[in-house]
Protein backbone atom coordinates (compact mmCIF):
# COMPACT_ATOMS: atom_id res chain seq x y z
CA UNK A 1 0.00 0.00 0.00
CA UNK A 2 1.66 3.22 -1.13
CA UNK A 3 -0.11 5.26 1.58
CA UNK A 4 1.04 3.06 4.48
CA UNK A 5 3.66 5.59 5.64
CA UNK A 6 0.96 8.28 5.92
CA UNK A 7 -1.51 6.25 7.97
CA UNK A 8 -1.95 6.71 11.72
CA UNK A 9 -4.10 4.04 13.31
CA UNK A 10 -6.78 5.26 15.72
CA UNK A 11 -5.29 3.49 18.77
CA UNK A 12 -1.89 5.06 18.05
CA UNK A 13 -3.45 8.49 17.55
CA UNK A 14 -5.25 8.28 20.91
CA UNK A 15 -2.12 6.96 22.66
CA UNK A 16 0.01 9.83 21.30
CA UNK A 17 -2.39 12.39 22.77
CA UNK A 18 -2.92 10.69 26.12
CA UNK A 19 -0.65 12.91 28.24
CA UNK A 20 -0.85 16.03 26.10
CA UNK A 21 -2.12 19.26 27.61
CA UNK A 22 -4.40 21.66 25.79
CA UNK A 23 -1.86 24.29 26.81
CA UNK A 24 0.71 22.65 24.53
CA UNK A 25 -0.61 24.69 21.60
CA UNK A 26 -0.23 28.47 22.06
CA UNK A 27 -3.21 30.66 21.19
CA UNK A 28 -2.91 32.48 17.88
CA UNK A 29 -5.90 34.69 16.99
CA UNK A 30 -4.96 34.56 13.30
CA UNK A 31 -4.57 30.78 13.11
CA UNK A 32 -6.54 29.43 10.15
CA UNK A 33 -8.20 26.17 11.12
CA UNK A 34 -9.70 25.46 7.72
CA UNK A 35 -9.70 26.55 4.09
CA UNK A 36 -13.15 26.42 2.52
CA UNK A 37 -14.17 27.02 -1.06
CA UNK A 38 -16.53 29.66 -2.39
CA UNK A 39 -18.90 29.03 -5.24
CA UNK A 40 -17.81 32.12 -7.13
CA UNK A 41 -21.18 33.86 -6.82
CA UNK A 42 -19.54 37.31 -6.66
CA UNK A 43 -16.50 36.52 -8.82
CA UNK A 44 -14.07 33.67 -9.31
CA UNK A 45 -14.29 30.66 -6.98
CA UNK A 46 -11.55 30.76 -4.35
CA UNK A 47 -10.27 29.23 -1.14
CA UNK A 48 -10.97 31.24 2.00
CA UNK A 49 -9.08 30.77 5.26
CA UNK A 50 -11.26 30.82 8.38
CA UNK A 51 -9.75 31.25 11.83
CA UNK A 52 -10.29 29.34 15.05
CA UNK A 53 -11.95 32.45 16.50
CA UNK A 54 -14.33 32.66 13.54
CA UNK A 55 -15.52 29.08 13.98
CA UNK A 56 -15.69 29.23 17.77
CA UNK A 57 -17.52 32.57 17.88
CA UNK A 58 -20.21 31.10 15.62
CA UNK A 59 -20.59 28.13 17.95
CA UNK A 60 -20.85 30.41 20.98
CA UNK A 61 -23.55 32.48 19.29
CA UNK A 62 -25.64 29.33 18.96
CA UNK A 63 -24.83 28.27 22.53
CA UNK A 64 -26.36 31.59 23.64
CA UNK A 65 -29.65 30.31 22.15
CA UNK A 66 -29.80 27.54 24.74
CA UNK A 67 -33.60 27.50 24.66
CA UNK A 68 -33.45 26.09 21.13
CA UNK A 69 -30.40 23.80 21.16
CA UNK A 70 -29.90 21.13 23.82
CA UNK A 71 -27.08 18.64 24.29
CA UNK A 72 -28.00 15.28 22.80
CA UNK A 73 -30.33 16.63 20.12
CA UNK A 74 -29.70 15.65 16.51
CA UNK A 75 -28.66 17.86 13.59
CA UNK A 76 -28.73 16.58 10.04
CA UNK A 77 -26.11 18.18 7.80
CA UNK A 78 -27.06 18.00 4.13
CA UNK A 79 -24.60 20.73 3.15
CA UNK A 80 -21.23 19.80 1.63
CA UNK A 81 -18.66 20.02 4.43
CA UNK A 82 -16.12 21.72 2.14
CA UNK A 83 -18.13 24.98 2.09
CA UNK A 84 -18.09 27.39 5.05
CA UNK A 85 -21.82 27.01 5.79
CA UNK A 86 -21.68 23.22 5.74
CA UNK A 87 -18.54 22.93 7.85
CA UNK A 88 -19.13 25.71 10.38
CA UNK A 89 -22.87 25.22 10.95
CA UNK A 90 -23.19 21.57 10.02
CA UNK A 91 -20.10 20.03 11.63
CA UNK A 92 -18.16 22.26 14.05
CA UNK A 93 -21.00 24.13 15.76
CA UNK A 94 -23.16 21.10 16.59
CA UNK A 95 -20.19 19.10 17.88
CA UNK A 96 -19.14 21.99 20.16
CA UNK A 97 -22.72 22.04 21.49
CA UNK A 98 -22.85 18.31 22.14
CA UNK A 99 -25.35 17.56 19.37
CA UNK A 100 -25.38 14.30 17.44
CA UNK A 101 -24.49 15.01 13.81
CA UNK A 102 -25.87 13.02 10.90
CA UNK A 103 -23.77 13.88 7.85
CA UNK A 104 -25.28 13.25 4.43
CA UNK A 105 -22.24 13.94 2.21
CA UNK A 106 -23.93 13.35 -1.14
CA UNK A 107 -27.63 14.10 -0.85
CA UNK A 108 -30.03 12.57 -3.33
CA UNK A 109 -32.87 15.14 -3.24
CA UNK A 110 -35.47 12.42 -3.84
CA UNK A 111 -34.40 10.74 -0.59
CA UNK A 112 -34.49 13.83 1.65
CA UNK A 113 -37.95 13.08 3.06
CA UNK A 114 -36.96 9.49 3.89
CA UNK A 115 -33.75 10.69 5.57
CA UNK A 116 -35.65 13.21 7.69
CA UNK A 117 -38.17 10.55 8.71
CA UNK A 118 -35.46 7.98 9.45
CA UNK A 119 -33.19 10.23 11.55
CA UNK A 120 -35.81 12.65 12.95
CA UNK A 121 -33.32 15.50 13.39
CA UNK A 122 -34.46 18.40 15.55
CA UNK A 123 -32.18 20.70 13.54
CA UNK A 124 -31.07 20.95 9.93
CA UNK A 125 -29.17 23.51 7.91
CA UNK A 126 -29.75 23.60 4.18
CA UNK A 127 -30.40 25.77 1.16
CA UNK A 128 -33.94 26.81 0.20
CA UNK A 129 -34.26 24.02 -2.37
CA UNK A 130 -33.84 21.41 0.39
CA UNK A 131 -36.90 22.69 2.22
CA UNK A 132 -38.96 22.87 -0.95
CA UNK A 133 -38.02 19.22 -1.56
CA UNK A 134 -38.98 18.39 2.02
CA UNK A 135 -42.41 20.00 1.66
CA UNK A 136 -42.97 18.12 -1.62
CA UNK A 137 -41.90 14.74 -0.23
CA UNK A 138 -44.71 12.20 -0.74
CA UNK A 139 -43.53 10.31 2.36
CA UNK A 140 -43.57 13.36 4.64
CA UNK A 141 -46.88 14.59 3.25
CA UNK A 142 -48.46 11.35 4.56
CA UNK A 143 -47.04 11.82 8.05
CA UNK A 144 -49.26 13.76 10.44
CA UNK A 145 -46.70 14.61 13.11
CA UNK A 146 -43.28 16.08 12.45
CA UNK A 147 -43.15 17.84 15.81
CA UNK A 148 -39.59 16.60 16.38
CA UNK A 149 -38.50 19.45 14.07
CA UNK A 150 -37.25 22.43 16.11
CA UNK A 151 -34.97 24.50 13.91
CA UNK A 152 -34.61 24.07 10.18
CA UNK A 153 -32.60 26.98 8.81
CA UNK A 154 -32.08 28.02 5.20
CA UNK A 155 -29.10 29.94 3.91
CA UNK A 156 -26.76 30.20 0.98
CA UNK A 157 -29.42 31.50 -1.41
CA UNK A 158 -32.57 33.60 -1.40
CA UNK A 159 -35.92 31.98 -0.70
CA UNK A 160 -38.81 33.34 -2.75
CA UNK A 161 -41.72 34.45 -0.55
CA UNK A 162 -44.13 31.98 -2.18
CA UNK A 163 -41.77 29.08 -1.51
CA UNK A 164 -41.24 30.20 2.10
CA UNK A 165 -45.01 30.35 2.64
CA UNK A 166 -45.44 26.87 1.14
CA UNK A 167 -42.73 25.39 3.38
CA UNK A 168 -44.06 27.13 6.50
CA UNK A 169 -47.64 26.01 5.77
CA UNK A 170 -46.33 22.45 5.40
CA UNK A 171 -44.47 22.70 8.73
CA UNK A 172 -47.50 24.14 10.53
CA UNK A 173 -49.81 21.46 9.10
CA UNK A 174 -47.44 18.81 10.48
CA UNK A 175 -47.32 20.15 14.07
CA UNK A 176 -43.96 21.92 13.81
CA UNK A 177 -43.72 24.73 16.37
CA UNK A 178 -41.32 27.06 14.55
CA UNK A 179 -41.31 28.27 10.91
CA UNK A 180 -38.29 27.98 8.65
CA UNK A 181 -35.51 30.26 9.89
Each model region followed by its residue ranges:
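Conserved AMP-binding/adenylation subdomain of ANL enzymes
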Residues: 56-74, 82-123, 133, 137-138
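Short beta->alpha linker loops
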Residues: 54, 107-108, 129, 158
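Conserved pre-ATP/AMP-binding loop-to-beta segment of ANL
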Residues: 2-8, 14-37, 44, 67-74
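Short beta-strand->loop structural element characteristic of the AMP-binding/adenylate-forming
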Residues: 46-49, 77, 99-106, 181
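Conserved structural elements of the adenylate-forming
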Residues: 13-16, 20, 29, 48-69, ...
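Conserved S/T- and glycine-rich ATP-binding loop of Class I adenylate-forming
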Residues: 32, 37-41, 75, 81, ...
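Gly/Ser/Thr-rich phosphate-binding loop
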Residues: 121-126, 135-181
